[in-house]
Each structure stands twice: as C-alpha cells, then as structure tokens.
A protein has these predicted regions:
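ABC family nucleotide-binding domain
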Residues: 2-209
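Conserved beta-strand-loop-alpha-helix hinge in the C-terminal portion
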Residues: 209, 217-230
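A cytosolic small-molecule/anion-sensing beta-strand core signal
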Residues: 214
Length: 230
C-alpha cells in the first residue's frame, strides 16, 4: 500500500540545511496497524503529514496505492486525500458552529455525494458509533471523549483505505482513550489500514508494529504480537 524510499524533509535557512526527516525507508501493507513512536521533535507528525498528502517530502519517493505521489498533480493529490485517507487529530478539529451531524457530513459534501446517500451514510455512522442522541448538539456541548468519537466518525465516513491518527488520545483520560483505541482496533479488524502517532506504550500495543524515530531517522521496528490485556 505504502512505500517510502530515501525520504528526506529539510528546511534551508541562511545557508544552513536542517533535516526534519532523513533517509526514511518504509513499507506498510494494506490492513496493518502501525504505530510511530519517538521523542518530541523526532519528526513523527511530519512523517504522518507526508503520508497524508498534507506536506511534501524534500527528497525521495513516496508510492501510495501504486502511484508515485510526487508525479501527481495537486488536483489528483486532493482527490486521493479525500477518497482514500481519513485523519484524526489530537485537537479534534471539529467546527464549533456546526452540529455533530453537520461535522460528520462535511467530507461527503466535499466529495459531492448526493443528498439521499449522504443522509443514509450519516445515519449509519451515527448508529454505528452510538451517537444518534448527540447529532443535534454542538462540539462545545460534548466531552473531550465524545468530540474525539465524532472526529473518528467524520474521518471514516467516506470509507477510507488509510486512517492516520496524530496523538488521538493525547487529551483524553484513560477510559476515553481505551474507548477510542477499541474503536480503532475494530476498524482495523474490518480492513482499514491505520497509522498512529503516540507516546503511550499502552496505546501502541493495540497495533501490530512499532516504528521508532529519533532525530528524524528510523531507529528500529518492533513487531507487537501480544494482545492488549483488558
């Protein structure tokens, strides 16, 4: 699904080049649940943004679903992002002026899905995530955990092949974190490829593989074969 070859990301300033990522080589197969870990400033979020077409590598080759990303037009990149990739952020990124229903519906509006189909898809996702009773509320009326559930629902309503999550449980307490991660595990069991960034070993254990970054470079990979204990 994903191949990264010699990926560099750097900033040139006053005749000095500062590397954020350097020499990243990585393959991720469809259906994996991968965790990216490392200290602050290691380049984790930058790598996630490159994978999600929110940023471009300075050097190297990124292949997604058989397409070489740097050869794609901006329009094509946007289409791939909307059609195949869902994003979940630590800071929810919900629109306070829109209801839960309207926030979840938004990706379908961008994709010009017809009204009747939109209504059916939103109704299905509200039911699936047990938030039908919250559909007319606004984000400030929800708890942090409830807002993140809405964020996950919005991210997957278009049935993405790839879900990217940047510290998805960073602002949540333990019970809420486990709820979100159980949700991710079920999505992964249903075939969604997931790549998450987290500092938490406990949250990392939900995946099957850990990628460690330090100073922008890949340090080592750990298979995570043990089941998460309930």
């Amino acid at each position: 699904m994903i191949q990264l070859r010699d990926i560099d990301k750097y900033i040139d300033k006053r005749f000095q080049r500062t590397f954020i990522l350097k020499g990243i080589n990585l393959d991720i197969e469809e259906g994996e649940f991968v965790t990216i870990m490392g200290p602050s400033g290691a380049g984790k979020s930058t790598l996630l943004n490159i994978l999600g077409f929110l940023d471009d590598a300075s050097e190297g080759e990124y292949t997604f679903l058989g397409e070489t990303v740097h050869n794609l037009s901006e329009k094509k990149k946007s289409e791939y992002h909307k059609s195949h990739i869902g994003f979940v952020f630590q800071a929810y990124h919900l629109i306070d002026e829109l209801t839960v229903y309207e926030n979840i519906e938004m990706p379908l509006l961008y994709r010009k899905v017809k009204s009747k189909q939109r209504k059916a898809m939103v109704a299905d996702i509200l039911d699936r995530f047990n938030i039908v009773a919250k559909k007319d509320l606004f984000p400030p009326q929800l708890s942090g955990g409830q807002q993140q559930v809405v964020g996950v629902a919005r991210a997957i309503i278009g049935s993405p092949k790839l879900l990217l999550a940047d510290e998805p449980t960073g602002n949540l307490h333990s019970e809420q974190s486990e709820q979100i991660m159980d949700m991710f595990k079920k999505l992964n069991d249903d075939g969604v490829t997931i790549i998450q960034v987290t500092h938490s070993e406990k949250m990392a254990a939900y995946g099957n593989r850990i990628i460690n970054l330090k100073d922008g470079a890949l340090v080592k990979e750990d298979p995570y074969n043990q089941a998460v204990e309930s």
